[in-house]
Each structure stands twice: as C-alpha cells, then as structure tokens.
Curated annotation (Swiss-Prot):
SUPFAM superfamilies: Nicotinate/Quinolinate PRTase C-terminal domain-like, Nicotinate/Quinolinate PRTase N-terminal domain-like
Protein's UniProt name: Putative pyrophosphorylase ModD
NCBIfam families, per the entry: modD (TIGR01334)
UniProt KW keywords: Glycosyltransferase, Transferase
Gene that specifies this protein: modD
Taxonomic lineage of the native organism: Bacteria, Pseudomonadati, Pseudomonadota, Alphaproteobacteria, Rhodobacterales
Organism: Rhodobacter capsulatus (Rhodopseudomonas capsulata)
Amino acid sequence: MFLIDDTALMALIREDVPAGDLTTRSLGLAAEAGELTMRARGAMTVACSEEAVRILQLLGAEAWIATASGRQVEGGEMLLFARGQVEALLAGWKVAQNLIEWASGLASSATAIVAAARAVNPAVTVACTRKSVPGTRALSLRAVTVGGATVHRTGLSDSVLLFAEHRAFGGADALAAQIARLRASCPERKVVVEVADVAEALAAAQAGAEVLQLEKFPPEQVAAVVAGLGPDWRGHVAAAGGITAANAAPMRRRGRRFW
C-alpha cells in the first residue's frame, strides 16, 4: 500500500489555490453552505477516492468515501460526498476531481492490461515500472496497484537492474563480469538485465541473469528468446515498453516464463 500523506496532498492544494479562490471570494459566496457530489462519468476502476476525500477535509469540509479505490464502477455511480462552506468545497473541487480522473485512468488501464494478459494465463504478473510523470510516482504506483498490477521497482534503491549504460563502463566483458559482481554483491536480490536483442538476451541468461527485461521487443522476438532459452532455464522473461491491453495477450502467448 502506498501511503499518501497530508504534506503531499497539501502541495496539490497549494498548487491550485496559492492565495485562496478569487472568484468565490469576490462573489461573496465563501461562507455559504453547500454540498458536493462526485460521480463516475463512465465505467472505470476507481483510484485515489480516499485522497480526494482527504483533500476536501484538509480544506475544512466534511467528506465521505462512497466508493473505495480498486472498485470497478459504471457511469453515474457515486464516488464521494462532501458538505461545508462553499469556499472549502470549491477550493478542493477541481484538485480532488483531477486527482480521481487521472489516477482512475491509470488504474483502469492497468485493469485492462491485466485482464488481457490473464485471459491467456491467469498466473501472469503485470508489473509497472517507475517511469512516471515527475513528482507523481507514489500516486502513480498507488493507482496501478489498485488497478490490479504490481510494482516492478519504486526507484533505484530497491532492486538490481543492469542497463546498457552500466555496461558501457565495464569493458569488453562487461555483461558477464558485471552480472557476476552483482550476484556476489547483492545475493538476496534477483539480477535483472535489460537487453536490446535476442543474442544479448541469451548471452545475459548464460552469464547468470535471473530476469531478462526485453525492451520494446515485438512478439516474434519474445518468442525467439523463449525458444532459445530452452525448457531448463529457471529465470523470468519480462517484456517491457509499449505494453497495452491490445498487445498484452499476444506477448503472453509467446512464452511461459513471463511477467
């Protein structure tokens, strides 16, 4: 579970309301009493409804969750309800709405990709990378996890991933030498190696890589890697980059050891 604290939510509020709501204040509406309801526009996987409610609470409104994150809803279903002074409701309205819209879009995409992949193999794992809009990583990872995916890595500190950029500083035998060093230095971590073609994937597996990250491989190249590895290789194959609900199933059909 990704905990989004009040400091992060206050930063979203301050971005949109740095000095109050000029329009509401100028109309003399600030102290009026009001109610706010948010409903789904269409079918979606809900994400960050809890954070949206907290945004309204931080501004002084009373607010309640109607639909928790991770639930799939149809258009028209209530997501949250709030009441309080108009100044608080309108200050938090768009911040909360934009957060739910954006996060639920990520969650819904994750749900669709997971469903497409698991239609081929119910045991497959869909893992999302750390590549996110700067400043939104925790919210992004929260959204994709409530959508049914898991996390590939949260950052550079939690996993071992050998890129070509590392190997560029390792000399002629960088692939084998760096894999060996990582396995010795980080014995409790799987060594993941990003590869650019079939030959490099097979060489990395031979050198001891435990996960092969196939960067933007078409399905036929994924199949070639799986075939080349043979039935005795015990690692994992991960197709990375450009995975959508439309191509998740074809990718999964190309191999057994896949996540």
